[in-house]
């Protein structure tokens, strides 16, 4: 009986091993597929979103200020990983290993580090800019004039390059098969890993935390009228801009904190801590960090009204590159109309098409207006106004930065419209 049981156990053991191995392989394939899906989604949103951010600032003069210069810089840093490192990681995932050679591995690791550190330092620069704008408003124009702002931006990227160069001398850029990436190896040098975490993560985030805490304190004091001596009036736009960048900071900290704290723990006691870290947690911490690069552009669109409006204009211009017809004659947006205005005759239609960026229809107090926006001269011309029951022509022109908001157009022309 003992021999039979022993024989049966011997017969079942290989099958059990194969079953466990098959389960592990299946789980590994499922995890790999999930990582590929997450990375593809991140690349698409990263590229489209950050291009929208850059185009929005370039197109809209309302967004062209010192603070948004660092926002564009942050978008460029986020774009870097989507253009090269993430695609080669995808290749490694599909090939189930690194097949591109050591040169591509080093380039990918360098650009990955450049993007990450550039993002950290740009977020820090944005926080300092917001702090100076709100807490030291009287000196802000001197601190952030055009020349000094470009100097700050250049300094940000110089520090970024200086911070990433030591990786080549330490030899810490290596391929890690668990995450299919050529990245910073946490176990190469404990002292260097601790230095990286402190300089690249803890110190910048401490500076950002200090800046935003001071802003929050000031906002609360002004709101409850504790600071009667505060000269600048905090507008809702200022508060929304501050809130937007604060959310950017919080999400960055949340996405990157697990990876940095794991690296710090491993560096302090590598032989004891490293074997105890589950592989799924290690992989999750990396892909959380990777995912962060696509979030900022989404945050701007959700929380910042100016960016959201410019996103819509850019996307609409892709659908109707010559004219956009927005009908709000019934008090709400009904959609885009692809029909020309009845005011546009055969004689002047070509000229209007040539200089018009978009066509906006609205009705207010029984009047229907067609507004042509001229992007080159930033002018608004109300070329047709129909009153019920009678019709009349009216024109109003003025150099302005208004870009089509209904309230702005009403203010522009309410004081007097010259009859043709």
UniProtKB/Swiss-Prot annotation:
Tissue: Moderately expressed in dermal melanophores.
GO terms under cellular component: plasma membrane
Gene Ontology molecular function, alphabetical: G protein-coupled receptor activity; melatonin receptor activity
Glycosylation sites: 5
One GO BP annotation of this record: G protein-coupled receptor signaling pathway
Segments traversing the membrane: 35-55, 74-94, 107-127, 153-173, 193-213, 246-266, 280-303
Keywords, alphabetical: Cell membrane, Disulfide bond, G-protein coupled receptor, Glycoprotein, Membrane, Receptor, Transducer, Transmembrane, Transmembrane helix
Protein localization: Cell membrane
Cysteine disulfide partners in this protein: 105-182
Membrane topology: Multi-pass membrane protein
Positions on the Cytoplasmic side per record topology: 56-73, 128-152, 214-245, 304-420
InterPro entries associated with the record: GPCR_Rhodpsn, GPCR_Rhodpsn_7TM, Mel_rcpt_1C, Melatonin_rcpt
Side Extracellular, residues: 1-34, 95-106, 174-192, 267-279
Similarity comment: family membership: Belongs to the G-protein coupled receptor 1 family.
Function: High affinity receptor for melatonin. Likely to mediate the potent effects of melatonin on pigment aggregation in melanophores. The activity of this receptor is mediated by pertussis toxin sensitive G proteins that inhibit adenylate cyclase activity.
Protein name: Melatonin receptor type 1C
Protein encoded by which gene: mtnr1c
